A protein has these predicted regions:
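Bacterial Sec-dependent N-terminal signal peptides
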Residues: 1-26
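C-terminal functional modules
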Residues: 364, 368-374, 378-472
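Generic surface-pattern signal
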Residues: 10, 14, 45-52, 70, ...
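Structured, solvent-exposed acidic/aromatic patches
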Residues: 33-37, 71-371, 386-393, 399
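Membrane-proximal, proline-rich intrinsically disordered regions
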Residues: 17-67, 71, 77, 96, ...
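Residue-level detector of short coil/turn "hinge" positions at structural boundaries
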Residues: 58-62, 288, 350, 403, ...
Length: 472
């Protein structure tokens, strides 16, 4: 692997007011002028961009989760990840832009003797929360990854055990939670919560529960304890969502718009996926007009892995392709689904049905539906927790899959973990639906020994190899 040293990359336009981006006058030839806040804001934007973009060169997880499919070019819906070198394209921004900028921001914060102690602690805390989120994505995508020797002068960093990384992430997150106090952090450079450190504290507790439930099948004790301590301190409404606000103008528009909005592109590469649309049609889901466009009054999804006529199928909705459409790192609906599962598994945090209903209602109202529509939806026997088919994993898994629309990464994690819905591989698939990304080819070239050791440790560097928490 290329030596992971700190590069000061050209910075994106960053924020100067509530969830807005504006120009910073940065002398890109003189890294000493770059502030800790600029680096933090840049790291946040790069993280969200990487998770949000639908570019087939970087992030194809909406295809894999059959939320969308392609009209013409079927390599990615059929799980070809080598033609465009997707593992490298997805891996690189996390290390080179996000984590390195966070590390440098932390260094500058530590060295700034003019900072008030409480502000310094808050800056360190929100930097750590963002880093923990990023590291969890790396582990959930690849398994063992460079961690303890990453971002150092080590030319060929070792790959750390994924479960051990997770354990350390809990330690880091707990430390961040403990040091947050009311007050400022990065001011306008906090592009996620606009300097609302109390909101970051809720996000930290919600993230802790997210990591915990991911471990539920392999370390129930840790998972239960973490959720028990954070259950009452996470998100309690959609107002708490970790939502990143984009702008109407480039380069700060949502990357979805760059790939789908006719103002920015003439390409017509994406249509709704048959799997999700059919499931939503079956239960008359009120979110359909917010998720997709209609075709002659109906919602129609294209087949996965075959060519689809653009005009014949539903497309991502006009709302989703707007340049200022916000991106979610985590939301209240997800927290309620976590609590529903914790209640079903361990009898903690209330009843499964109460949290299940709250999760679905939160999703419907977030997208623009009404409370009355949510009640009607939940009253259907195939949706109601008491009568829906299957175990708690199936009940929650099916509804969480719908709620995680447009969040391909999160839907992919939950599908692997809960095993619902039972997705079928694409037509003419090149492999199983991937359970992980393979290591980038550059890693095999530059860090071969460590990559090979990691591949052996995880059971093979293959897309069908399960991440350590995926045991069923």
């Amino acid at each position: 692997m290329k030596k992971l040293i700190i590069y000061i990359l050209p910075l994106v336009l960053l924020a100067s007011c509530a969830k807005n981006l504006d120009e910073y006058n940065i002398d890109q030839k003189n890294p000493k002028t770059v502030s800790a806040g600029s680096l933090f804001g840049n790291a946040l934007k790069q993280l969200v961009d990487n998770q949000t973009t639908p570019s087939v060169n970087i992030n194809v997880l909406r295809f894999w989760m059959q939320q969308w499919t392609a009209t013409t070019y079927q390599d990615e819906p059929r799980y070809n990840i080598t033609t465009r070198n997707i593992p490298l394209a997805y891996w690189t921004p996390f290390y080179r832009e996000v984590l390195q900028d966070l590390k440098e921001s932390r260094r500058l914060t530590d060295e700034d003797e003019s900072l008030d102690a409480a502000v310094k602690n808050n800056r360190i805390a929100v930097t750590e929360i963002t880093a923990v989120y990023t590291w969890s994505v790396l582990v959930n995508t690849w398994g063992d990854v460079p961690y303890t020797e990453a971002l150092t002068d080590v030319n060929q960093p070792k790959y750390d055990d994924a479960a051990s990384i997770y354990a350390d992430l809990f330690t880091r997150l707990d430390a961040a939670i403990a040091q947050i106090t009311p007050g400022s952090n990065f001011g306008g450079s906090d592009l996620l919560y606009n300097d609302d450190t109390a909101a970051w504290l809720k996000f930290a507790h919600s993230l802790k529960m997210k990591l915990a439930i991911t471990l539920a099948d392999v370390d129930a004790a840790t998972a239960q304890a973490a959720i028990t301590t954070s259950a009452s301190q996470g998100f309690t409404s959609n107002a708490d969502n970790a939502a990143f606000a984009y702008l109407n103008t480039t380069p700060n528009n949502n990357p979805i718009s760059a790939n789908l909005n006719p103002v920015y592109t003439s390409r017509q590469d994406y249509v709704a996926g048959e799997t999700l649309v059919t499931l939503m049609n079956t239960v008359n889901d009120p979110r359909r007009p917010f998720y997709f466009t209609a075709v002659n009054g109906a919602y129609l999804g294209g087949r996965i892995g075959v060519n689809n006529d653009y005009a014949s199928y539903s497309k991502p909705s006009d709302r989703i392709i707007q340049p200022d459409f916000e991106a979610l790192l985590m939301d209240y609906s997800e927290v309620e689904f976590i609590l529903a599962e914790a209640a079903a598994r361990w009898g903690i945090a209330g009843t499964p049905e109460t949290h299940y209903n709250a999760a679905i209602t939160a999703s419907i109202t977030y997208w623009g539906g009404t409370g009355a529509q949510a009640l009607a939806y939940l009253a259907q026997p195939q949706v109601a927790y008491a009568t829906a088919a299957g175990t708690y994993k199936q009940k929650i898994g099916m509804q969480k899959y719908i709620a995680l629309y447009n969040r391909g990464y999160d839907a992919w994690v939950e599908w692997r973990r809960l095993d619902y819905p039972a997705l079928r591989p694409a037509a003419e698939a090149e492999s199983v639906i991937p359970l992980r990304l393979t290591y980038p080819t550059s890693e095999r070239t530059l860090n071969r020994s460590n990559v090979e050791s990691a591949a052996t440790a995880i059971g093979g560097d293959e897309v069908g190899t399960k991440i350590f928490w995926d045991v069923f």
